[in-house]
C-alpha cells in the first residue's frame, strides 16, 4: 500500500490541475479572437434562433437552438440562459433534448398563470414551452409529416423540464414546412393563440389549455416577401406612440429573400380579432435592413409594458463557415420595439434597451468634430474591442454624403454612411469575408425620415456593428478583419457637419462570469 500522504498529495495535485484548467478556460472563453464582449454567445459550439423568450420572477429567459457537440448545425437542443437586466447573462444547463419524436426545433414559452393546462397550480404556475419536433428519419424517408408540435413544462423557473406524455399536441397534416410555434394568451376570447409558419404563409390556432388546438385561419400566401421559406413568426399588440390607437404586429422571418440577400425578418401591421389577422400595410417592411439579424422574436410576460426583441446575429448564407472557433453565432443586443408614425408612414422602430447604458465606461466628447467644408476627413484612435458612438450629422444640402469607417493598420474597414439618395448603408467589402462569396458587399437600408438632421448610435463589438438611426431604422452586420479595428475615420463632402461626437468604451458582460 502506498504512503497515505503521497496519495493525498497526488489527489490534491489532480484537483489543483483541474481547477486551474477550468479557470483558464473561463479566462479565455470570452476573449478569443472575434468573441463579442456585450452580445450573448454560447460558451461553446453552435447556436442559432432565439427560442422560448419569457419573463418570470425577475428573470428574462433566453432559450436558443443549440448543438452542444459541434460548431456547425446538428441535432437541435434548447440551450438556456437567464438575465436580470437583458444585458448580462448566466449560462444554465441544456433545457430540452431530442427524443423519440425528433429534434427540438424553434418555439416559444408562456407562463400559465390560470393553470389552464393543469401542469401547475394557481399558486405555482407552470412555464410551458411549445416547440417543433423534427424527425430526421421521416425527412430522409421523403415524408412530409416529419414536423409536429410538442409541449414541455417546468415548475422550477425553467431549470428542469418534463415532456408532455401525449405529444404531439398538433400532428402534421402532410405539410413539409410546419414549424416554429409562437404562443400567447388572447384575453378577449379567453384562449391561447398560436401562430405557426407553414412554408409560404402562417397559420393561426386556438386552444383553451395549451394541449388541445383548433385551426383558425391562415395568412400571407399572397402578401409580403416570398423569396424563401417563412419561419419563426410572432404576433403581438402594440400601442401607437403618442396616441390611443392600438395595432397588431406580425413578424415573419424568411430565408432566403431578404433585401440584401439571404435571411431577414419582415413585418406586417394590422388587426387581429382572435380569429384572423388583417394587414394594413401594402409595402414590404423589414425589422432590420442589415445582413445579420434573423429569426428575431419578442419576450412574453414582460411586466413593464415594453415590447422587447432579440435576433440571431447571422445569415444562413454563411453562418456555418464564419471564422470563429470555440463557438458559432451571437445574438443582437436586446432591443425595444415601438410603433410610431414616421415621415414614411406607420413603422416598427428599434432602439437598444436602456439597460445597455450601464456598460458605459470611459467616454470622450468632441465638439465641432466635423465642419461644413469640402472633402473633410477626421480620425480618432480606438482602444479596446467594445464601443458605443453617438453623433449628430447635419446636412446642408440634399446631395451631401458622409461615411464613418472603422479601420485597422492593414487598411481593412467597415463603413457606415448615407449616400446622395438618403440611403443608409454598411460597406463591408474590405472587412474580412474571404470565407464566403455572399459575405462581402455594400448593403443598403431605408431611413424613416428625410430630415437634414440625423442622429446615429453605433454599437461596435469585436465582430459586429449595429447602426441605430434616431428615426428607429437599424442595420446589423458582422465583420472579421485580420486585425482588430483601432481607428475611426469620418469622411464627408461639402454640406456635412458633426457638431458633437461621443465615444464610450463598454465593459465586457463576461467579466462577472469570469469571477
Where are these regions (language model features)?
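Bacterial Sec-dependent N-terminal signal peptides
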Residues: 1-25
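Alpha-helical transmembrane segments and their juxtamembrane interfaces
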Residues: 12-16, 138, 480
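Beta-rich carbohydrate-recognition and catalytic domains
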Residues: 20-181, 185-231, 239-289, 304, ...
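Beta-rich accessory regions
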Residues: 242, 271-283, 287-515
